[in-house]
Amino acid sequence: MGREDRSGKRKSREQSRKRRVPELGYYYIVTDTDQTEKNYLEGLRNSIPEELKGKLVIKVSKSRTVDLVKTCKEGSSLYPQYCEPWVVFDRDQVKDFDGIIKNAEQNGIHAGWSNPCLEIWLYAYFGNMPYIQDSVSCCNRFATEYEKRTGQKYDKAEKDLYKKLCEVGNEESAIRIAQQKRKQCIENGLLIPSEMIPSTMIDELINEIRMKM
């Protein structure tokens, strides 16, 4: 049943839904981890100024890697007219990395991928995206840099990861670096995501949300 407005008249569910549409965007983001990506994205969500909460909404969900697109498609279908669907994941050891990205794009879902891992994007907050081929080496090198910059050990379960990166790093510079690295890959003929090292697309998600805050 609908709710009553101030005049006592009943409102339909459709009318109620229209009133709740976030005018600056509703971002439905599905990731395949319980730690780094999820904590980072929830930190981004928590950074939304109080006066914009309700107008700019970020919902982060978890799914198995193979079900990322399916889960995102199902969740975003609840708000098809204004939802911005994203899947966020690493190349890491994902077998069908390029296939997942292609599947997402074919379903109108943005793919915020990172190659070799999310830490290559986090590294950019410190002014650099070094050439590192595997995720283990990338995580270890980022952990060393993170400790040097913050004085704290890097922990994938760190809830304040986004906040700390913004405090000791430079997000605007990180976005520029990511754009430059992606451009370099393309200029070098590396057009397939699994071949684009180092590279990421998550900067596009961050930049889009930043512009609305």
Question: Regions from the language model: what does each represent?
Answer:
Residues 2-6, 12-24, 38, 42-59, ...:
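C-terminal accessory helical subdomains adjacent to catalytic cores in phosphodiester-
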Residues 11-15, 69-72:
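Short amphipathic beta-strand starts and helix->beta connectors
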Residues 26-38:
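Catalytic nucleophile-elbow at a beta strand-turn-alpha helix junction centered on a G-D-S/GDSL motif
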Residues 31, 89-91:
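Short glycine-centered, acidic/aromatic-flanked micro-motifs in structured strand/loop junctions
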Residues 65-80:
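Short N-terminal edge-element motif at the start of the domain
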